Regions:
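Positively charged n-region of N-terminal signal peptides that target proteins for export
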Residues: 1-4
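Sec-dependent N-terminal signal peptides
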Residues: 7-8
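Beta-strand-enriched cores of mature, soluble protein domains
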Residues: 20-153
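N-terminal signal peptide c-region/cleavage motif recognized by signal peptidases
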Residues: 14-16
Length: 153
């Protein structure tokens, strides 16, 4: 159960890649685990997963890439005796094919989705700072996930 929930969290970060009222920035992505650490404590479990992702945009506006790579790190906490996480967060960093940088932060939601926003960027990404997205894992399997994301503003 913890792996499924963590995979769900992992699939949500790229949702922040585009927003600011731009419904065209919906898309999907894949995340492959590159590192995973778990800390067991008396009160619960803390997990950290780093993934190498590819984000593919359905209909990017002119000047934006159709796809880009990202490195994401996700954290979650599950209290002892619980099946669902009590919380989680994630951060992604990406450099697009043109060399522009973007950073995203997200928080796990109670419905299993991940709410993300663009926190900063350079070049074309500066116009999207503050844009919000929602992501949901479509498939999770053996250290990888496939997810969908769409803007919420």
């Amino acid at each position: 159960m913890k792996n499924i929930i963590l995979s769900a969290v992992l699939g949500f970060l790229p949702a922040t890649a585009f927003a600011g009222g731009h419904a065209d920035f919906a898309g999907h992505g894949t995340g492959i685990y590159s590192d995973r650490k778990t800390i067991e404590a008396t009160a619960g479990t803390h997990s950290m997963v780093t993934t190498n992702d590819v984000w593919i945009y359905d209909n990017p506006p002119e000047g934006f890439p159709a796809a880009q790579k990202a490195i994401c790190t996700y954290f979650q906490v599950i209290a002892t005796g619980q099946q669902q996480p009590s919380g989680g967060s994630g951060t992604c960093q990406a450099v697009d094919p043109d060399g522009d940088i973007s950073l995203w932060n997200g928080v796990a939601q109670s419905d299993g989705t991940l709410a993300f926003s663009v926190t900063t960027g350079t070049g074309k990404w500066t116009a999207l700072i503050g844009a919000k997205f929602l992501g949901k894992t479509r498939h999770s399997f053996g250290g990888a996930s496939v997810y969908d994301f769409s803007p919420v503003n």
